[in-house]
Every structure is written in C-alpha cells, then in structure tokens.
C-alpha cells in the first residue's frame, strides 16, 4: 500500500491472484531481488506464501538501469546468488529467465537470454534485452533477421554467460551500461560501444 500510495492495493493484488487461479490460469508473483533484499525475511515469506497457495514466483534481479542507473551496489553478489539458488531448490516454484524450466532438480542454468529476448521500443529500436539499453537496429529501417544476426555477432551476446549480463555481470555493467543518459529511449548504439574485435 505504501509503495502504490493507495489503500488496499495489497489486498486487491492478492485477491486478483485468487481470481486468476480460479479461472484456471497459473498465477505468478513477481519480485525484484538485489543485494539490498536477497537475505531479507520478507523475500522468503513471499516465496513461502507463493508455494503454500500453489503460485509461481518470477524473480528478476535488480538491474542498475533506468532510475537505478549507476547504482551498482544493488547488484547481487556471489553470496546472494548462492542464496537465491538455495531458495530455488527449497521452494521449487521460483522461476527465472536464466534458469532451465524443465530441470526437476532446480539446479540447471540456461544462461543470459540477450538477443534471444529482444525489446522493441515504440520507436522501432531493437534492444538486446529489456534491461540492457543497447540498440542493435531498428525494425522500421531494416529486417528483424538482419538485426538479430548482427546482435549474435557481438561477442558478449554470442558467447554463453551463466550470469545475467544486465543484473549480475559487473564487468559488463560498468563497461557498457553506464553511458550518460543511457535509457530505453536513448539506448547506446552497439556499433559505437563495441570494438571491431568484439563484433565478428
């Protein structure tokens, strides 16, 4: 209620989950986790609530972009990641784009989904990820296949990364996500920020 600035926001959201479930759909809770709350008891209470009610919880890691740009202290460290992995095994209903959803043991990692999970702005700009504000093309000016092919020529997006580039790879973050005024509507241009050696 405090975050939304409205009374009974929490109550309505919780009731909404029940309505979704009663309609035969699979309700997901969504939480952003960073270094600031990875070990917070509220996080684990939410996971327990979610499991007890047969929901799933979609986890997004905190990313230093947008309003949090240049706030690298929010990024999960190795200890945070291990803790989140342990919670994944413990609760079994924690979902993340980085993880293999078919792994019954809740251990396997697919890896970062940049370029595989594009974000297209209303202006047609194609970003490698909703959280990585790097433009690889514009669908109003060139075919999507051409844009994707270019994206996969970039070393960081072509090579497997078990870390989320936007929210866990501090080297990538400091090198490519901290440009002045970089945002969804003012993305850095891939051809300008990556060297010739980084693009095959």
PLM regions and their residue ranges:
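Radical SAM enzyme [4Fe-4S]-AdoMet core and its adjacent flexible, acidic
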Residues: 1-114, 122-127, 131, 139
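Flexible mid-to-C-terminal extensions adjoining Fe-S/redox cofactors in radical SAM and related proteins
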Residues: 126, 130-200
């Amino acid at each position: 209620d405090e975050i939304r600035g409205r009374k009974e926001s929490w109550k309505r959201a919780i009731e909404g989950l029940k309505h979704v479930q009663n309609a035969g759909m699979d309700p997901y809770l969504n939480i952003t986790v960073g270094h600031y709350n990875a070990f917070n008891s509220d996080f684990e209470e939410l996971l327990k609530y979610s499991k007890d009610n047969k929901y799933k919880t979609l986890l997004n890691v905190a990313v230093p972009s947008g309003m949090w740009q240049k706030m690298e202290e929010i990024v999960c460290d190795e200890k945070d990641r291990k803790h989140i992995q342990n919670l994944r095994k413990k609760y079994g209903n924690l979902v993340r784009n980085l993880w293999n959803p078919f792994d019954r043991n809740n251990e396997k990692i697919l890896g970062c989904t940049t370029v595989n999970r594009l974000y297209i702005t209303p202006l047609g700009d194609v970003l490698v990820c909703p959280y990585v504000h790097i433009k690889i093309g514009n669908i109003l000016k060139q075919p999507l296949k051409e844009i994707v092919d270019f994206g996969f020529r970039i070393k960081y997006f072509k090579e497997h990364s078990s870390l989320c580039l936007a929210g866990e790879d501090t080297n990538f973050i400091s090198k490519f996500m901290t440009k002045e005024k970089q945002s969804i509507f003012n993305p850095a241009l891939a051809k300008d920020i990556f060297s010739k050696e980084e693009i095959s």
